[in-house]
Amino acid sequence: MRVAAFHAGLSAERRAAAYLIAKGYRILARRFRTPYGEIDIVARRRQLLAFVEVKARRSLDDAAYAVTRKQQQRIINAAQAWLMAHPEHETFEFRFDAMLIAPRRLPRHLLGAFDAST
């Protein structure tokens, strides 16, 4: 089951990245890992960075509820580490998005799904 879930996650992240590229984003990193947490996708469009959490579930509604506050905090902490490791992006605006993936559905991109104050 773990292996199947891992591969399903990779597939969802590939779909999410392709969707972002089609929307004009450039993918800067995938599965950026730190001791504080992981960011599924770091994407850039113009002077904006999007730290994207990808959630794949049986339905888009189920995926929408899958990002917990604890996960949000880990993503925020990982984003801070990413920004420290990439000072060339320190002047960019940034936000935390979610990409919801479900079978036989177009991905749903939630802009600003959460913020650093949550």
UniProtKB/Swiss-Prot annotation:
Gene3D superfamilies (alphabetical): 3.40.1350.10
Single Gene Ontology MF annotation: nucleic acid binding
Domain of life of the organism encoding this protein: Bacteria
Any Pfam family the entry gives: UPF0102
HAMAP family: UPF0102 (MF_00048)
PANTHER family linked to this entry: UPF0102 PROTEIN YRAN
Family: Belongs to the UPF0102 family.
NCBIfam families per the UniProt record, alphabetical: PRK12497.1-3, PRK12497.1-5, YraN family protein
Protein name (Swiss-Prot/TrEMBL): UPF0102 protein Nwi_0116
Record lineage: Bacteria, Pseudomonadati, Pseudomonadota, Alphaproteobacteria, Hyphomicrobiales
